[in-house]
């Protein structure tokens, strides 16, 4: 029997916080009883990666919220994977809907970033998800499969990749996909993986859900067989993040 997938909870602090209130949040996380069989990763703003890594309990990993597709160069405002590692972070979030739709990042660029980050030794939380008009048009599968294919084409070793399904219509809106909606897409994503990567990889790759996850909604979502964890934004800045980490 294949081993169970380790539950994964990632907090995305986005462009929020200052040292004083992030320090309070970190103290709350450090003092909390967290399950040993759940992997926890926090993604602070780039300016606070070093601060978070120094203050957080070592069992909680740190991620960057973005990186570029090359190591160095004349790319004002960007950060390379090697720099991220130098700050003590071990993960990077790529393909978030805000990077896609606010900053205009293409599937191709996201794929290039994934390839470079993995080559440099970072773990990648790769985000995919449809917009509301795409869901209403009945093309959710088409959209997320196309996004996943570009990511898969750039992955050689899936051990350091987590797929995050984040329906854009549920991010920061207070709307959450029902457990059934989340499970349906996660199950189809795993089915897509089974036909495009080795079956063992399809089984072991974690597919997590993001989109207005709260302490009130997390337990039922976590009970779904193909929901392997969460990406949490607003609630990750609040004490209820501890409840979400303990959802499984």
UniProtKB/Swiss-Prot annotation:
It holds the Pfam family TIM. Its EC number is 5.3.1.1, 4.2.3.3. It catalyses: dihydroxyacetone phosphate = methylglyoxal + phosphate; D-glyceraldehyde 3-phosphate = dihydroxyacetone phosphate. Homodimer. Substrate binds at residues 12, 14. The modification N6-acetyllysine is found at residues 14, 156, 194, 238. The gene is TPI1. The modification N6-methyllysine is found at residue 194. There is a cross-link at residue 142 (Glycyl lysine isopeptide (Lys-Gly) (interchain with G-Cter in SUMO1)). This is Triosephosphate isomerase. The keyword Lyase applies. Pathway: Carbohydrate degradation; glycolysis; D-glyceraldehyde 3-phosphate from glycerone phosphate: step 1/1; Carbohydrate biosynthesis; gluconeogenesis. The active site is at 96 (electrophile), 166 (proton acceptor). It comes from Sus scrofa. The lineage of its organism: Eukaryota, Metazoa, Chordata, Craniata, Vertebrata. It is found in: Cytoplasm. The modification N6-succinyllysine is found at residues 149, 156, 194. InterPro entries: Aldolase_TIM (IPR013785), TIM_sf (IPR035990), TrioseP_Isoase_bac/euk (IPR022896), Triosephosphate_isomerase (IPR000652), Triosephosphate_isomerase_AS (IPR020861). Keywords: Acetylation, Cytoplasm, Gluconeogenesis, Glycolysis, Isomerase, Isopeptide bond, Lyase, Methylation, Nitration, Phosphoprotein, Ubl conjugation.
């Amino acid at each position: 029997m294949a081993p169970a997938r380790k539950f994964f909870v990632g907090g995305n602090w986005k462009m929020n916080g200052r040292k004083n209130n992030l320090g309070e949040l970190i103290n709350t996380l450090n003092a909390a009883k967290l399950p040993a069989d759940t992997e926890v990763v926090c993604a602070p703003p780039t300016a606070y990666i070093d601060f978070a890594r120094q203050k957080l309990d070592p069992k909680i990993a740190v991620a960057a919220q973005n990186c570029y597709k090359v190591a160095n160069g004349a790319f004002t405002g960007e950060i390379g994977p090697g720099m991220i590692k130098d700050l003590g972070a071990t993960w990077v979030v790529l393909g978030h809907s805000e990077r896609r739709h606010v900053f205009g990042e293409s599937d191709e660029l996201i794929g290039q970033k994934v390839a470079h980050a993995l080559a440099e030794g970072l773990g990648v939380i790769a985000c995919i998800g449809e917009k509301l008009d795409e869901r209403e048009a009945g093309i959710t599968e088409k959209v997320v499969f196309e996004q996943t294919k570009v990511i898969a084409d750039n992955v050689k070793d899936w051990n350091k990749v987590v797929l995050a399904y984040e329906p854009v219509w549920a991010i920061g809106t207070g709307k959450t996909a029902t457990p059934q909606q989340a499970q349906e897409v996660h199950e189809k994503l795993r089915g897509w993986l089974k036909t495009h990567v080795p079956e063992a990889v399809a089984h072991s790759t974690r597919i997590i859900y993001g989109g207005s996850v709260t302490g009130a909604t997390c337990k039922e979502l976590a009970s779904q067989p193909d929901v392997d964890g969460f990406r949490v934004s607003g609630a990750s800045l609040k004490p209820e993040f501890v409840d979400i980490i303990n959802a499984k």
